[in-house]
Design a protein with these regions (language model features):
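Switch/communication elements of ASCE P-loop NTPase nucleotide-binding domains
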Residues: 1-55, 198-333, 349-353
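Short, glycine/charge-rich beta-strand/loop segments that flank catalytic centers
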Residues: 61-64, 179-186, 281
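Conserved helicase/translocase motor-coupling segment
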Residues: 338-389
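Extended helical coiled-coil dimerization/tether regions that scaffold
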Residues: 2-6, 12, 123-242, 254
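Conserved P-loop NTP-binding catalytic core
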Residues: 45-140
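Short active-site oxyanion
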Residues: 150-152, 271-274, 339-340, 369-370
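Glycine- and acidic
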Residues: 29, 144-149, 245-248, 337-339
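Hydrophobic, Leu/Ile/Phe/Ala-enriched alpha-helical segments that form helix-helix packing faces
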Residues: 46, 50, 162-174, 264, ...
């Protein structure tokens, strides 16, 4: 039996048009839509509203369902506290959190996470992902862990997971270099294996350090590698209940974006949820390949200052995804187009595309953001019932 996770989960979001979307504890909600429609703003709203009731733009309000596990227990398990007399102070990834003897009771009574938000909500915007890759200060093996790299540096469970996940996308491992000095950079390269004999272990350690010094370091690489690694560093910490991930495909080649979708879907437990904004068909395909039952799609459009929403829930998505013809077609690309033409055959797609191209050249006729896709005659009805956004 899985023990109850401390914190809670977002069980409902209410959009600015009054529509409500119920959310399960393990749902992965994906926001899609054109630029400036409100995808990223939705994540910002959720992050702000999870702390306290506040003005918002796209998401009007959220409902948080809390668990009964004391937050003092999870804080003590995540970080070493500093006794301040009448309370204990914790540093959680740069966020200071204090616990008094009455804190657990007040937390349970409040509708929001308040000052403990960043213990349960991981807000992964682009800036957070890039900067988290910077080497943290070195600590003793049993010192206070204030950075995700500290966990990978001193716990083999985290180190191995981080390296294996990185290798899936880039074909090479990463290693925290605890011998670097005052900092712990992540080094890119094959894990060091010393086979020669040394006169003592100190000599072996010095040789190990000298080899790692020749490796490239993650924080000095391009934004694609840093963004990918940044997401991994947060996913690695399993005490988070909810992840807000803004455009995880940023700076990534499409194959790596698909792998990122797979890793997110595989890593999040049944007591973790995510809200993701994306322009990437590959992110969605990666998620669907590993956890189709967990996916909800919210397509956001905007006319002037008015948002409109179309929602595709778990059951409808799974039914469409389980059809082999649709699964291996480009139907997922329809989520990112304004118009979709369903064709019986590939030759029909080509013919209509040629006609459209001709009309665009000869007149002012423009069919914006149109996708021609092959679905076959048999699955038309299913698509019209379940996949029209």
């Amino acid at each position: 039996m899985t023990s109850e996770k401390a914190g809670g989960y977002i069980s409902k979001i209410t959009l600015n048009n009054g529509d409500s979307l119920p959310i399960q504890e393990n749902d992965i909600v994906v926001f899609v839509g054109p630029n400036n429609a409100g995808k990223s703003q939705s994540l910002k709203d959720i992050y702000a509203l999870s702390k306290e009731k506040s003005p918002s733009v796209v998401v009007k309000e959220i409902t948080i369902t809390k668990h009964s596990t004391p937050i003092s227990k999870v804080l003590a398990g995540v970080a070493s506290g500093e006794n301040k007399g009448d309370h204990t102070s914790y540093d959680i990834l740069g966020h200071n959190m204090n616990i008094w003897n009455f804190s657990d009771k007040l937390f349970a009574q409040n509708d929001f996470y308040e000052d403990y938000r960043d213990l349960f909500i991981a807000n992964l915007d682009t800036s957070a992902r890039l900067t988290i890759c910077n080497p943290p200060s070195n600590i003793t093996r049993d010192g206070r862990k204030t950075h995700p790299i500290h966990y990978a540096a001193f716990d083999s469970k985290y180190r191995k997971w981080l390296s294996v996940s990185f290798k899936k996308a880039f074909g090479i491992e990463i290693t925290p270099n605890t011998q670097y000095g005052s900092q712990i950079p992540l080094c890119i390269g094959k894990p060091v294996q010393l086979t020669e004999e040394f006169e003592d272990e100190q000599s072996r350690l010095e040789k190990y350090a000298s080899i790692l010094d020749t490796y490239k370091q993650v924080h000095n690489q391009g934004d694609g590698i840093k963004s990918f690694t940044g997401i991994l560093l947060y996913l690695m910490l399993d005490y988070f209940c909810t992840y807000l991930i803004d455009e995880p495909e940023s700076f990534l080649h499409p194959p790596q974006a698909r792998i990122m979708g797979q890793i997110i879907g595989q890593t999040l437990s049944d007591q973790q949820q995510a809200f993701i904004s994306t322009h990437s068909e590959e992110i969605i395909k990666g998620l669907l390949e590993v956890c189709p039952k967990r996916i909800k799609i919210v397509r956001i459009t905007r006319v002037e200052d008015t948002n409109m929403f179309s929602i595709l829930d778990n059951n409808e998505f799974e039914e469409v995804w389980n059809d082999p013809l649709l699964r291996y077609s480009n139907i997922m690309a329809s989520l990112f187009h304004k118009s979709v033409v369903l064709c019986e055959s590939d030759s029909d797609c080509k013919m209509y595309s040629i006609i459209e191209s001709h009309l665009k050249q000869k007149s002012k006729y423009i069919l914006k953001h149109c996708l021609y896709t092959v679905v076959g005659n048999i699955v038309w009805e299913k698509l019209l019932l379940h996949f029209v956004l």
